[in-house]
């Protein structure tokens, strides 16, 4: 089993993908994916992944697998705008690489306002 606890550093396997006012913050016991001072008119993203630059057939995670985490938002739902989520997907919309578009294959936990 692979365990990543982010207590001291972000392992080099994790590539950072930050847009707009997205930030990664190590707290000493966790990793926070932060979108600071944003509004509903601008895209922002704080992400780690391990598939940038890989062909889909080389993506590292395959079933069966287990993902355990603790997640929370810093504001009440009524103050959030946009989308947020975490999980596994096949990057169907070419967000982080030069791949042809494809149908989504995902297990994703998702928030949308």
Where do the PLM segments sit?
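Secretory/extracellular carbohydrate-interaction modules
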Residues: 32-113
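Extracellular carbohydrate-recognition regions
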Residues: 1-21, 27
């Amino acid at each position: 089993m692979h365990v990543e606890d982010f207590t001291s550093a972000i392992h080099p396997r994790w590539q950072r993908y930050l847009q707009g006012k997205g930030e990664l913050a190590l707290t000493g016991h966790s990793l926070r994916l932060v979108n600071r001072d944003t509004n509903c008119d601008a895209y922002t993203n704080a992400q780690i992944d391990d598939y940038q630059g890989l062909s889909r057939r080389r993506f590292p995670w395959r079933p069966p697998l287990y993902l355990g985490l603790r997640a929370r938002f810093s504001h009440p739902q009524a103050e959030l705008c946009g989308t947020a989520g975490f999980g596994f997907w096949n990057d169907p919309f070419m967000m982080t690489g030069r791949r042809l578009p494809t149908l989504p294959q995902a297990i994703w936990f998702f928030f949308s306002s």
